[in-house]
Swiss-Prot record:
This is Required for respiratory growth protein 9, mitochondrial. The gene is RRG9. The lineage of its organism: Eukaryota, Fungi, Dikarya, Basidiomycota, Pucciniomycotina. Signal peptide: none annotated. It comes from Puccinia graminis f. sp. tritici (strain CRL 75-36-700-3 / race SCCL). Pfam families: Neugrin. Residues 58-80, 133-144 have a biased composition (Basic and acidic residues).
Length: 207
């Protein structure tokens, strides 16, 4: 064997030895490191009891709170911008709404009435389906309350009271509004003052 062949074999052997030393000195990846697995799982198992303790303590705090406070906090979470209930209309407005729908259901549909009275279509549907009517005592109390807050005292005063809600209703339905008024509020012919007789006829009967 000549000297060149010997040097070539020694060089190959040295390179293989150096490669083995490099492989032994390089650390294993985190996924293949046998010691990394138990430590990672241990960290995960250590977080779980802390979360359970926190949730348990939170539940105990909620149980110690009064029911009204729990309900109030739930409403705050549900309505972060505040509670804004839908608009409520008065009893005369409900009666007017039913009258308009009965007069012309096509013209005064749910969407049109919802736009005119500034309420939701679902509220209009519920009002039309409702058959409840106030008794005389309730109607009297409602009338007194309206008079207290400054409602008009004329026969069609409640129509003017609802002017803001019905200002876009066509004027040709004035007879419908008048017919929907309570019978007690309509002006009877007996309420007009009697005409005074001529003075000549009075003298004739005096004779």
């Amino acid at each position: 064997m000549n000297s060149s062949t010997i040097r070539r074999s020694i060089g190959l052997t040295g390179s293989l030895a150096r490669q083995k030393r490099v492989n032994r000195s390089s650390p294993l990846p985190a996924a293949q490191d046998p010691q990394a697995g138990p430590s990672g799982s241990k960290a995960v198992t250590e977080e779980a009891p802390e979360n359970r303790l926190f949730n348990h303590s939170q539940e105990q705090k909620d149980e110690d709170k009064p029911q009204w406070l729990i309900h109030k906090e739930a409403l705050r979470r549900k309505f972060p911008d505040g509670w804004n209930p839908p608009k409520k209309i008065s009893r005369p407005s409900m009666a007017l709404l039913r009258t308009l729908h009965q007069t012309d259901p096509n013209q005064f549909s749910l969407s049109i009435l919802s736009e005119k009275f500034k309420i939701s279509p679902e509220a209009v549907r519920r009002i039309l389906r409702s058959k409840w009517e106030p008794n005389q005592e309730t109607a009297k109390k409602t009338e007194q309350r309206q008079q207290t807050v400054g409602a008009a005292h004329s026969s069609d005063g409640w129509v003017h009271h609802e002017k803001l809600e019905t200002d876009q209703i066509p004027l040709n339905l004035a007879h419908t509004l008048q017919s929907s008024l309570p019978s007690s509020s309509k002006i009877s012919s007996s309420s007009f003052p009697r005409k005074s007789q001529p003075r000549s006829s009075y003298n004739h009967f005096k004779k």
